Amino acid sequence: MHRARFRRLVEAAVAAIPPEFAAQMDNVEILVRSRPTVEERQEAGIGPRDRLLGLYVGHPLTARGSYYGNTLPDRIMIYQESIEAVCRSEDEVVEQVRTTVLHEVAHHFGIDDERLHELGAY
């Protein structure tokens, strides 16, 4: 899939976030990357054979105190090649992009992987 098309899928997934949540994402940058770097894989605790579809790097809203401010934006990376590798069709890519964006946005709101499992997000 061309990068521009993939980027539009990510933008559509972000645009579908309800306004009450989107309003709390003013210091979050969402990036499309081909694949994770070695450092990003290490940060996520991902082994060399595992796939990393997305990554949130920053300070979740639940961890911010009154001291928080004047900081670089949190970052959400969405990895195109990783997502394409686990999908068999464009429809699956569309759904996986949506799922991955929402998963990483959930981390921004302080929801960890264990809680996402409990909520049935997987």
Task: Describe the predicted segments one by one.
Residues 1-96, 108, 112-117:
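Active-site rim/adjacent substrate-binding subdomains
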Residues 96-104:
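Short alpha-helical catalytic segment bearing the HExxH-like zincin motif
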Residues 118-122:
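Short hydrophobic/aromatic patches at helix-to-coil boundaries
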